[in-house]
Regions:
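Bacterial N-terminal signal peptides that target proteins for export
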Residues: 2-11
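C-terminal motif of bacterial Sec signal peptides marking the signal peptidase cleavage site
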Residues: 17-20
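Surface-exposed, well-ordered secondary-structure segments
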Residues: 25-258
Length: 258
């Protein structure tokens, strides 16, 4: 009888410890927002989770609430295809470019797609790289899109808008176009380089998808973004390579990193 009671006691103790651990970790779990197809309401829901106020492109931190958004459409032709995009364009000191984000890639560079009346004669929606893309890629906000060139990876780091002071954010989300296969889309890191989690975007062949993650606190120092399983190219379609590009970026108001 004593042996049975001891075993039962140990079982209950282990169960209580497991529940306690789950309770502690549960509060740290981020909110994940996903959608595909008609994603307008999904995107707006994500904005609301970040505070619902677009803090625009003014320098300085606007407090712990609100978000910054980039839709790429304000860029001039000189900064769009067939030309490369300046990685620090939205990390400028002055409005409206003071949005506190720096982009980098291990590839050849970054590119924003041409609009339909650009002076270079470049096809829109990355048709300058592969003419098929102009018909395949859709836009969420007209009419420019964003992608790395020579790689399918982009790293995002954050700054207090208008300064070179490193920052952290509560979350980051973005619109994908033409996601055909399951793959890790975002991996979030804190300022010590620890992974905060990997997340996949929903599928939407020739359509739009959205993935956004929100943490309880501003923890995100860097985000690694994967654009499909391969880089854009003139021979896309050969093999099992799935390419995808992006439209709007939405991220929490950057807060000074400790």
């Amino acid at each position: 009888m004593k042996s049975t009671r001891l075993i039962l006691f140990k079982f209950l103790l282990l169960a209580m410890m497991a529940l306690a651990c789950n309770g502690l970790s549960g509060g740290d779990q981020p909110t994940v927002v996903t959608g595909s197809g008609d994603i307008a309401l999904t995107v707006d829901n994500y904005r609301q989770l970040l505070g619902g106020v677009n803090n625009g492109g003014d320098p300085g931190s606007k407090g712990p609430s609100g978000y910054r958004e980039i839709n790429w459409d304000s860029l001039t032709d000189e900064l769009a295809a067939p030309n490369l995009y300046a990685p620090d364009f939205f990390n400028a000191a002055e409005a409206p470019r003071a949005r506190g984000i720096l982009l980098d890639t291990p590839g050849d560079g970054l590119m924003v797609s041409a609009d339909s009346d650009n002076p270079y004669g470049a096809l829109p929606r990355f048709g300058n790289i592969n003419p098929q893309y102009a018909d395949i890629f859709k836009t969420f906000s007209e009419e420019r899109l964003f992608s790395p060139v020579g790689s399918n990876i982009v790293n995002l780091t954050f700054f207090v808008p208008g300064t070179n002071q490193p920052a952290v954010v509560r979350g980051f989300g973005a619109v994908y176009t033409d996601v055909d296969t399951n793959h890790t889309a975002f991996e979030y890191f804190d300022q010590d380089g620890n992974s905060l989690g990997k997340f996949e975007t929903p599928l939407s062949d020739n359509g739009l998808s959205f993935l956004g993650v929100v943490f309880e606190e501003a923890l995100v120092f860097r985000v690694e973004v994967r654009y499909g399983t391969g880089a854009l190219g003139p021979n896309d379609g050969d093999g099992d390579v799935d390419v995808a590009v992006m439209d709007n970026f939405i991220y929490g108001e950057p807060q000074p990193a400790n």
